[in-house]
């Protein structure tokens, strides 16, 4: 049998075995595991001398698996494993063997013993092996090992002692490690085991560790892992054992630990052990006494002196050791800050006593701990600097909170704050080691951002100190930057940026109306001006960090750069600065930079700067008539659109370049129209001829390129190039529009008509024609359809109702497409809703949609049918997924498949489109002779839902709102919307009221109460739906009222047909009708949800 297992295990682990062979071998091994004598078989596999390490490992792993199963976890089986494995282990560890077992096998043996411990130790396991620790200590001759201090001690005995320690560590990890999430039952069991250990074995273990620490140094050097494992045990167990077992009155135990602080092999374990000891949870005053008693700062004085005298003592070779030491000292300091917080929050303590304790702890920190941590923070290694950050966060938060507690509080800390800020300045600088973008980003994330946050806290604590220090730092660097490295100049710009952020966020605590005239703001303005005066030096710099940071600084602080006199004719300084900034942008420093990331970022920032400084730019354009031409000529090389290669997805490999290139088109469009929109300066009107010929300089190359694409034919590269050109034209139009019309008026058609000149309309009429021609050639390609919709949407505000003839043709071409995707229809419906909103009072627009509605609805249904077919195919090919979704649909928006998701999104867009008719008072379109045939289809879409669609509450909300509004607008068969200028008062559709009643009433009652809809009234989204159903019923009641006969068809249908049909009790029917007829809208909705649906749902 053992040979057979060996063959099977080898087959599974042989990389040359095929999948079928491995699967068969695994099945056969599983069969052996399930046999009655499985434990005996795999014990034999482990202890057999002929078994190799792989077989032993597999055997041990299988034993763990078998012991944890209910069938094998019986006393006889566990005792068998215990007896055989311990007997074999004694020979393996203590026998005079030439070689010891490899670590991975020793770890697996520890896991087997830990499993036995968890299943047999303490009364929660029936007291099967309460002598666990005694037996293993005897097995490994622990007493002999720790009592023999002779250097000739048997090495195997020391290895056995080390193994015992590691076993204890694994046990502690199993019962006390807080990083694992355990069940409540498991946690209770672990607590029971820990209680049993405290009562019976912890003192023994503590004595073992104590004796290990007393071993002769020569023995320690013979087996350094023994001391490390001992220290690890103390550090691991200390969180839940009695601290007095480790800390005695004479600190003898602790002094034994301290002696390993300076031993090379044990330093890290020693640091971690002490860290765990000082982190032991205690009451604040007990913790303070404890921290003072252990006298750790005296033990660490050596390291403070060493690093202060020779910072180069830290090298890459010993970096891990110093990181561990820094973490220890940081944690030591944090413990004191925790004491401060706990004392302050203790309501039982006297205020004066609190102040005394806090002052005492603060003095300890300032005198003994902070000087050491400042040295570590000032070290050149980022990892060591970062290790100190948790303490600084706590301590600065303490200073910020208590700065107002006494007049002398801040002065007492002034030296610290001054030193700390100086170190922040130094450590914020990039080092020569940071050479790649990844290096810079890592430094920013791990070091610089934290230091920036610390600076911001210092501003709040002592504004004058911060401003004085940062001003001196920036001034000195600006003065000497030409002689310094690029890192110094980059840091200078970064600190100016930080100063501006502190001002904007008002960390200085100024009155809002005083911020712009305050000393910090004046200081910032001075630095910004000095930077701009260094133009020649700036342009000569070839460093991407400086280039990007400078542009960000200028754009985000434009309001500080330009004074409040920017609107006056005498503000020549501001004009010069503005032109200077434009020239910097339009140079190799920025927009023509050789580095792609700088170029792309500058293109965005350039346009952002233009839009933010609209007032300044308009004034400068008015004073410099040729400036627009100069700007256009300078940046025209950047306007050329080129598709160099295309990937498998049909997109440009350089899509990022094009996406950012669009910002330039928007920016140049903004400048052109801003130049011609100075009403207050030129008194221009829409009828005044304005020269927009400069647009030809931009558009003509694009049109020529489009013509070339049409001539070449529909290759993937050509199609993508056409897409890019159309997107560029649309983005240019957007820039032209926002340059002409104030941002808060962009959607006001009256303002648009007033400000948009006829010459511009003529230009864009030609553009619309060109787009249509291009679209007619390539309308079967979805990215061309997408770009055409995008561009036409940007032309609408400019052309206003003059775009309708072009829109008509565009819609025809889109609806004629045979492969229209669902997402395209969704976007298209949004585009049409925008048209309805903007031109709902226009007769031509009304006629356009009157003709369009029927083919549009048919197209939507065609796409939905295609989606349903795809969904059926997906469901049939993957039935388990569909079943699982149906079973878990309760109370959630379920996405069954991609096709189902597409259908839901399309139906929601469809309902939103229908909503635009009621929102803009054009519902008469639905009642017209042309659309009367499609109206039943539309209404059926609104009253038909599947159970899964009911779970899509966001879609249902839109659908029910549309249904309510339809009933409100034409629920009795005539158009009831008085704001609808196209309604025909003589037109009436007979039977429409009866249709709404017969279709909607069942919806109102079935959705909440039919179990197939899984309606959970307690969930917010379903409760909202219930309010919509109540509103629907109320609208039905209102529209069904007949003032002539005083009858209401809705009430009649409820009382005589539907409610008796569903067997609603008579008293509830009477109550419902009474509330429906007497309550107002909001009152009825609340009653229907809280007193009708909710009450009846409780009885289900």
Curated annotation (Swiss-Prot):
Q: Which GO terms describe its cellular component?
A: cytoplasm; nuclear matrix; nuclear pore
Gene3D superfamilies found in the cross-reference section: Leucine-rich Repeat Variant
Task: Could you list this entry's UniProt keywords, alphabetically sorted.
Answer: Cytoplasm, Nucleus, RNA-binding, Transport, tRNA processing, tRNA-binding
Which SUPFAM superfamilies does this one have? ARM repeat (SSF48371)
One Gene Ontology BP term is: tRNA processing
Write down the Pfam families for this protein, in alphabetical order: Exportin-T, Xpo1
Cytoplasm as a keyword of this entry, yes or no, is yes
Keyword Cytoplasm assigned: yes
| The organism's place on the tree of life at top rank | Eukaryota
| Molecular function terms, GO-annotated | small GTPase binding; tRNA binding
Q: Where are the transmembrane segments?
A: none
Indicate the principal place this protein occupies in or around the cell.
nucleus
Subcellular locations according to the entry:
Nucleus; Cytoplasm
Purpose of the protein: tRNA nucleus export receptor which facilitates tRNA translocation across the nuclear pore complex. Preferentially interacts with tRNAs with mature 5'- and 3'-termini and does not distinguish between intron-containing and spliced tRNAs. In the nucleus binds to tRNA and to the Ran-GTPases GSP1 or GSP2 in their active GTP-bound form. Docking of this trimeric complex to the nuclear pore complex (NPC) is mediated through binding to nucleoporins.
Family membership noted in the UniProt record:
Belongs to the exportin family.
> Quaternary structure?
Interacts with GSP1, GSP2, NSP1, NUP2 and UTP8.
Name of protein: Exportin-T
Which species is this record about?
A: Saccharomyces cerevisiae (strain YJM789) (Baker's yeast)
Q: Which gene encodes it?
A: LOS1
């Amino acid at each position: 049998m053992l040979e057979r297992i060996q063959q099977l295990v080898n087959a599974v682990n042989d990389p040359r075995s095929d999948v079928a062979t491995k699967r068969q071998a695994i099945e056969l091994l599983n069969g052996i595991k399930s046999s009655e004598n499985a434990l005996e078989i795999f014990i034999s596999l482990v202890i057999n001398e002929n078994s190799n390490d792989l077989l032993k490992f597999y055997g041990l792993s299988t034993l763990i698996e078998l012991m944890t199963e209910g069938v094998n976890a019986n006393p006889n089986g566990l005792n068998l494993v215990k007896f055989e494995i311990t007997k074999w282990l004694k020979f393996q560890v203590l026998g005079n063997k030439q070689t010891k077992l490899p670590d991975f096998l020793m770890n697996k043996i520890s896991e087997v013993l830990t499993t036995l411990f968890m299943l047999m130790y303490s009364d929660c396991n029936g007291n099967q092996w309460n002598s666990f620790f005694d037996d293993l200590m005897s097995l490994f001759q622990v007493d002999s090992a720790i009592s023999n201090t002779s250097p000739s001690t048997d090495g195997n005995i020391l290895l056995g002692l080390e193994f015992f320690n590691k076993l204890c560590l694994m046990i502690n990890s199993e019962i006390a490690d807080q990083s694992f999430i355990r069940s409540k039952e498991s946690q209770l069991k672990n607590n029971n085991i820990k209680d049993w250990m405290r009562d019976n074995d912890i003192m023994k273990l503590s004595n073992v560790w104590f004796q290990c620490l007393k071993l002769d140094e020569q023995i320690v050097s013979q087996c350094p892992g023994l001391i490390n494992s001992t220290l690890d045990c103390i550090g691991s167990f200390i969180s839940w054992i009695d601290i007095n077992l480790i800390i005695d009155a004479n600190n003898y135990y602790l002094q034994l630990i301290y002696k390993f602080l300076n031993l090379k092999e044990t330093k890290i374990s020693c640091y971690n052990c002490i860290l765990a000891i000082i982190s032991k949870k205690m009451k604040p005053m007990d913790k303070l006494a404890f921290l003072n008693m252990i006298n750790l700062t005296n033990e660490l004085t050596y390291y403070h002196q060493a690093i202060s005298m020779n910072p180069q003592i830290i090298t890459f070779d010993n970096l891990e050791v110093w990181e561990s030491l820094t973490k220890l000292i940081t944690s030591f300091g944090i413990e004191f800050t925790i004491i401060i917080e706990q004392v302050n929050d203790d309501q039982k303590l006297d205020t004066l006593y609190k102040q005394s304790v806090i002052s005492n702890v603060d003095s300890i920190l300032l005198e003994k701990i902070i000087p050491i941590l400042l040295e570590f923070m000032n070290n050149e290694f980022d990892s060591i600097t970062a290790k100190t950050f948790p303490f600084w966060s706590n301590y600065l938060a303490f200073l910020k909170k208590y700065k107002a507690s006494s007049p002398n509080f801040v002065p007492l800390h002034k030296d610290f704050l001054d030193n700390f800020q100086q170190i922040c300045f130094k450590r914020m600088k990039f080092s020569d080691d940071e050479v790649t973008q990844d290096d810079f980003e890592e430094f920013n994330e791990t070091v610089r951002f934290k230091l920036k946050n610390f600076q911001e806290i210092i501003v709040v604590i002592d504004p004058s100190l911060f401003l004085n220090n940062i001003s001196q730092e920036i001034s000195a660097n600006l003065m000497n930057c030409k002689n310094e490295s690029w890192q110094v100049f980059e840091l200078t710009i970064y600190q100016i940026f930080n100063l501006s952020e502190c001002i904007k966020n008002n960390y200085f605590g100024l009155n809002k109306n005083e911020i712009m005239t305050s000393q910090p703001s004046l200081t910032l303005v001075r630095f910004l001006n000095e930077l701009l005066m260094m133009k020649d030096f700036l342009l000569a710099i070839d460093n991407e960090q400086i280039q990007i940071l400078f542009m960000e600084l200028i754009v985000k602080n434009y309001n500080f750069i330009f004074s409040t006199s920017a609107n006056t004719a005498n503000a020549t300084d501001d004009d010069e600065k503005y032109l200077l900034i434009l020239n910097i942008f339009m140079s190799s420093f920025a927009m023509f930079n050789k580095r792609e990331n700088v170029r792309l970022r500058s293109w965005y920032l350039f346009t952002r700067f233009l839009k933010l400084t609209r007032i300044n730019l308009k004034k400068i354009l008015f004073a410099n008539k040729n400036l627009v031409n100069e700007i256009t000529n300078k940046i025209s090389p950047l306007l050329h659109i080129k598709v160099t290669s295309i990937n498998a997805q049909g997109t440009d490999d350089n899509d990022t370049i094009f996406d950012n290139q669009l910002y330039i088109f928007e920016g140049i469009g903004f400048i052109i129209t801003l130049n011609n929109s100075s009403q207050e300066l030129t008194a221009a009107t829409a009828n005044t001829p304005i020269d927009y010929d400069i647009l030809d300089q931009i558009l003509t190359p694009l049109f020529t390129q489009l013509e070339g694409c049409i001539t070449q034919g529909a290759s993937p590269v050509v199609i993508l190039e056409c897409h890019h050109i159309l997107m560029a034209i649309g983005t240019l139009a957007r820039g032209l529009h926002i340059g002409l019309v104030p941002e808060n008026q962009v959607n006001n058609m009256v303002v648009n008509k007033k400000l948009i000149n006829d010459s511009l309309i003529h230009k864009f009429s030609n553009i619309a024609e060109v787009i249509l021609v291009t679209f007619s050639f390539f309308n079967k390609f979805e990215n061309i359809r997408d770009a055409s919709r995008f561009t036409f949407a940007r032309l609408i505000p400019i052309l206003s109702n003059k775009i309708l003839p072009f829109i008509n043709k565009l819609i025809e071409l889109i609806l004629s497409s045979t492969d229209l995707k669902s997402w395209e229809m969704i976007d298209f419906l949004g585009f049409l809703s925008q048209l309805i909103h903007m031109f709902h009072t226009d007769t031509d627009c009304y006629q356009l949609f009157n003709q369009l509605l029927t083919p549009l609805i048919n197209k939507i249904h065609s796409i939905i049918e295609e989606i349903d077919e795809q969904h059926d195919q997906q469901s049939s090919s993957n039935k388990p997924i569909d079943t699982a979704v149906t079973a878990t649909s309760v109370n959630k928006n379920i996405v069954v498949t991609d096709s189902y998701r597409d259908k839901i999104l399309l139906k929601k867009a469809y309902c939103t489109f229908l909503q635009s008719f009621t929102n803009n008072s054009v519902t008469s379109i639905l009642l017209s002779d042309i659309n009367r045939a499609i109206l039943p289809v539309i209404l059926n879409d609104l009253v038909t839902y599947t159970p899964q669609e009911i779970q899509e509450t966001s879609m249902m909300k839109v659908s029910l709102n549309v249904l309510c509004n339809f009933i409100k607008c034409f629920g009795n068969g005539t158009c009831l919307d008085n704001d609808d200028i196209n309604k025909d008062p003589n037109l009436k559709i007979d039977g429409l009221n009866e249709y709404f009643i017969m279709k909607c009433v069942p919806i109102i009652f079935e959705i909440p109460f039919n179990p197939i809809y899984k309606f959970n009234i307690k969930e917010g989204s379903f409760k909202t739906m219930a309010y919509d159903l109540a509103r629907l019923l109320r609208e039905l009641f209102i529209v069904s009222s007949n003032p002539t006969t005083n009858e209401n068809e809705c009430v009649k249908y409820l009382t005589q047909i539907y409610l008796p049909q569903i067997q609603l009790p008579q008293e509830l029917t009477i109550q419902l009708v009474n509330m429906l007829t007497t309550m107002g809208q909001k009152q009825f909705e609340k009653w229907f949800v809280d007193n009708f649906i909710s009450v009846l749902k409780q009885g289900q």
